[in-house]
Amino acid sequence: MADKITREEKTIATLDLVLRVVVDAGNWDVFSKRLVRYTREQYGIELPEDIGDLPDTSEVSKVLLSHLGEDKAVLSAYRIAELTQPSEMDRAKVTEGGLAVLNASRDESEAQNPSNPEPESIESDAVEDLGVAAESDPSDDEPDPEPEYDHREADHDSDADSGYYSADGGRPGTPVDEEPQDDSPSSEETASTVIEEAQTSASNDSHDDDTHRDDGSASEEDLERDALVAPADPFPNLRKCFERQAMMLTGALKDAADTADPPETLSVDSVQRQLERFVFNPDRRVPAEHLEVRYNFYPPFLTPKAIASYHIFAVTASIPLSCKANRSGSDLLAKAKESTFFKRLPKWRLGIEIDDGLGTEVTAVTELEEAKMVPLKDDVSRLQWAKMRGEHIRFFSYPSLHMPPKISRMLMETLLQPFADENQKAEEALPCLSDEEVLAIVDPTGRLHGEDALKAVEKRRAAVTMAVRYTATLELMERVFREPSMVKKMQEVLHHTFHHGFVALVRETAKVNLSNYATFHGLTYNNPLNNCIMSKLLEGADKEDYVVDSIYLFLVLTWQTAMGMWQQAIDDMTIQMYTEVFTKNKYRLYSLPNPTAIGKAIVDILMDYDRLTEEMRKALPNFTCQSQITAFRHFLLERSNIPAVAAPFMPSDFVPLAYKQSPPLLWDQVYLLQLAFYLTKHGGYLWEAPEEEANNPSNRTYCPCNLCSPHRMPGHNAALHNEILAIGTFEIRSPDGKTFKLTPELWTNAYLDKFDAEDFHPFTVFHYPENASRFASTLKACVTQSPEILSLIRQIQESREEFLLTKGKGVYKDPNTGETISRQPRDTARAQHAGDGQALPAPGAYTTGGNRAETAPAGAVRLAPDYQDGQFPIAKVGPHYHGPKNVRREDQGYRGGPGGVRGEREVVLSRRAGGRRFGRRNTRQSGYNERANRYFGRGGGGSVRGQQGEHPTTSPSASEPPAPSRILARGTPPSPERRDRQEE
């Protein structure tokens, strides 16, 4: 590459390239006027009016750069140049033969009038992608496909500019033989023929020959109209996508030219790396309006390296036979599943015996000597199938959990031995402390000699090495995770991840799904494509394995995020300061007796005791959705050459369950797996309701963990239950005009903040159902802390309902069920003028007769009976009314069918069909019986007239159906004798 140039020179070169293209196209005057107007309207910046009169394009570039700045100048020039260039549809009007002739004539003219050639730059490709024709090198063999803009016609009302093309690729009505032949007499003649044919076709289609010009050139007014009436583009979205991608590449390559030192060669890898950096780590100086479009153009489901700085690394190691998948049915696995307390790290010592074999606790089905995944007698179906298809698996890519590489290298070079220089292979680096210095630390009195002294020195070096490589990382893990606030935050995040407990209750109450939100480095994202109920679709061992593996991967992501944050915060000055501190303290570290003490001392120095650890806890963990964990699981299996579709393994299947059964390289994996088992039990994610209560709706959101029970569960907290019932049912107004209303949003915010530290047990599994007597805190609501307020509100609501049901007029329905809870009004006026719209009741109707209420709700699932003053409603017959209208009970069925929705539809149809018959009933007087009508709801013709005659003898008490339950209790209907006395 050429010498590095400044950013300003790069911008001027880009602008000059665009301006030269405009000059060559002959549109400079239009371009300059549009550019001045565009900058005035878009940015409020006045450019010099004489900018189009400047002699050189480089001078114009400098003026644009000084007035607009780098980004605005380039974007404005690109946009105006694109508007003044021929569109894709106009380019398509000229056939391939005409294009070749035009290109030949252009090359000939360029040979006669050579211009100053521009050196090839990375911007030229980007400008061509934007649709702006860049200067072509005369030595290029490929012709330029863009026609001269001066030859395009000005008629935009014809089909030539409409963007419509026939199925064979040409315009409708254009003969195929119009295409010029290759044996044309001359280039100029053929070019004019092509242009004339295009103009003739356009004029014939639009019947407007006055708009064509003989010289084939476009005036300034035509160009102005081109911008206002643009031809339809058959692929506008694709073209816009290419333009925006070209803008991204231009910006990325400009940044590369400014930041790369030394300059990188132009290759696919370098462009991809710079594009990822430009997309996911944008420059803060870039205007905000150009940032959001970047994320639309990264390949879907492709893991970007720029933001996965730590998560993509893995440690490929041999799978131990003692892994979790080979411990089915063992006591060790059963104890891990029943973990009831947060274990502390063991006391590390040298000479630990590691037994990572299959052991005698499990029974193998086959005798495969080389297989790592051994089929066992007690394997679940998932492992049976996976091991059968995964006999070839020997290694697994365990996710990387080590400290930041800069820290690890500094510790090794400061406390153990500097790395050898590759250029000086003959010289071996000396250890940080010589044998004499270590012996003086181990045996200050000088009692050890010979081999004993050498063994003591080697033992102390081994202890320091073990602490640097293994135990320091484990000690740091324990400090980050084993803290009450961290356990609380992890359980809250996992409740969101699995849509469990209080998160599910929020969705039931406020209709808000909080499980789709994810956070990363302080930014919140919404993932509506997430499936938050994946864990609830499994049962038994499959659900347990899935939940444990998901929590294990969540802990891995959390730890990797913490180490990535630390890695980004480390610079050369920090490493230098760490080196100085460890150099001063290396004698003290070597004087400590065991790896546990040495590891704690190293972490004390690195974390400044707990200051840096506290900062990590503040930023972690991130809210994680199940789709992220699923993608991470698939990524790890894919890195290990394990096709999940054939062998359904999980990453936690390859991790041992105990430190003594694991090689030291996997001790950090063992720690996170043990913590995953504990969090699974502590969070109650595997809780299931008893069989006799499986259908209880309250069990869908129940969780026994300390975060939920008893304070956040309405089944235990009566005050919370009453508050949930009062949401949106009242509004309180103060004398000064302020109002208070318990809305779902207000309740949700208070509910999420509800937490009682006294009843939270972070390091032990202490669930409320088994230990209810040991929870002493008062159970309160979220918003209204006084239960008397809720009781008063409930009483007011009940008294209001009582008043409406007894004294009010109209139809009152339950807002939740649609059930009619009041007596329906009688429309006596309509009964007096009943005509063809009325009908006899259905033959199978209520035996006391009468029609069903016309205003009965059509969508009610259950219907309530009508009472009035403790009695069944009795029809009041007017002087001209023969047959009751509203006496029928709403819960009565029809013709062998139950009451409800179906009965209502049938009665409407019967009224329409029997309207004439009802009109005939109004003229009959002989069948009228006043007492029968009062007590039995009958008219001249009964409801069962075809079966029992006009006056059935069935008593009303024998045909009364049982009354369904009501919201408010009512009195018992009196007997017929008592009603007789009341009437008399």
From Swiss-Prot:
Residues 479-597 form the RRM domain. GO terms for molecular function: RNA binding. It is found in: Host cytoplasm. Residues 137-147, 176-186 have a biased composition (Acidic residues). Coiled coil: none annotated. Might be cleaved by the viral protease. Phosphorylated. Tyrosine phosphorylation enhances preferential binding to tripartite leader mRNAs and allows ribosome shunting. The modification Phosphotyrosine is found at Y812. Induction: Expressed in the late phase of the viral replicative cycle. Residues 411-476 are annotated as: Binding to host EIF4G. It comes from the Viruses. Signal peptide: none annotated. Residues 945-958 have a biased composition (Low complexity). Disulfide bonds: none annotated. The keyword Phosphoprotein applies. HAMAP family: ADV_SHUT. This is Shutoff protein. It comes from Fowl adenovirus A serotype 1 (strain CELO / Phelps) (FAdV-1).
